[in-house]
Amino acid sequence: MEHFIDTYLYELRKVRDEKTIKKKEYLLKHLQDYSEDLPAFDQSEIFSFYEYLKNKNLKETTIRDILKEVRLFYEWLQEQGLNLKFDEKALKKLFQSKKSQEALKSKKKYYSDDEINLILNAIRGAVEGISTKHPIYYILTIFLLCSGLRISEAVKVRKKDFEVKRILTEEGEEKEVWFVKVREGKFGKERKALIYFFRPEWKRIFEERLKKLKPEDFFFTYAVKYPKSVKVFTLTDKTAKWFYWKLEKELREKGYEIEVNAHRFRNTYITKLATKGFPVNLIADWVGHSKISTTMDVYMEAEREKQLEAILERI
């Protein structure tokens, strides 16, 4: 393969500038890493190559450039008399499928588990090229996912607003059920919301944090160390929204097409509880929807999105 690529680039140097040649060389290097021989790119091989590139954490735009350059390289090979297949219809089908999936993601109302992991990892500094954020934003994100509160409601929660009830299950086992009191909800209404820890480690994070707070303390009080002092702040909805806006911007710059906003955390809470079998009327009470139809709409749209995603994955 190396001989053919070198010859291809040599011929192109006669008509293209060196910057373009270097880019093409970089793009074709991924083909060399993928296979020692020149593969026949039928639909199965094209999709396999795409998944290989995806697993290298390359940007979607870079993957497209690689596939397009490989197609041009194979056209040149065919002109040289080599009988090597490259299924252009399959490539077009792949691009259309991925375009549909990206469009779906851009308007999707809830987060998948992979998207939740991406956001949390970015906050922890576990995504390459993104610095570690203050731990308060990790806790805030978990809280929004587990409580369904609006961000304006969440930042006003105090330690005394948490309530842990112990109930007996049908099997006779004791189980904890967590609630949070929303004192200043939308339209000034008070309510209680179920806190459902979708992962056991999240509950432990909350337990440890509550131990450090006094009853009147805001839950989202945090300290920032400066060279000569430590200052204590209470998170505001404006600061939190600004944080998520900046985080989304950072992720997009690294090639991750994802929206990061509190409302989608809220909708994720609704969707997860509904799929676990919680009655929609109870969920509506917990999230403070005045109409049960609003809650039902979120759930039904999420179900339609999941069905569409499953279809697109099979294309």
Curated annotation (Swiss-Prot):
One of the GO BP terms on file: DNA recombination
Zinc among keywords: no
Domain Core-binding (CB) residues, every copy: 1-78
Domain Tyr recombinase stretches: 106-313
PROSITE patterns cross-referenced by the UniProt entry: CB (PS51900), TYR_RECOMBINASE (PS51898)
Keyword DNA-binding listed: yes
UniProt keyword annotations, A-Z: DNA integration, DNA recombination, DNA-binding, Plasmid, Viral genome integration, Virus entry into host cell
Top-level division of the source organism's lineage: Bacteria
GO molecular function, one term: site-specific recombinase activity
Catalytic residues, chain numbering: R150, K186, H263, R266, H289, Y299
PANTHER family per UniProt: INTEGRASE_RECOMBINASE AQ_AA09-RELATED, PHAGE INTEGRASE-RELATED
Assigned protein family: Belongs to the 'phage' integrase family.
Protein's job: May function as an integrase.
Protein name (database record): Probable integrase/recombinase aq_aa09
Lineage: Bacteria, Pseudomonadati, Aquificota, Aquificia, Aquificales
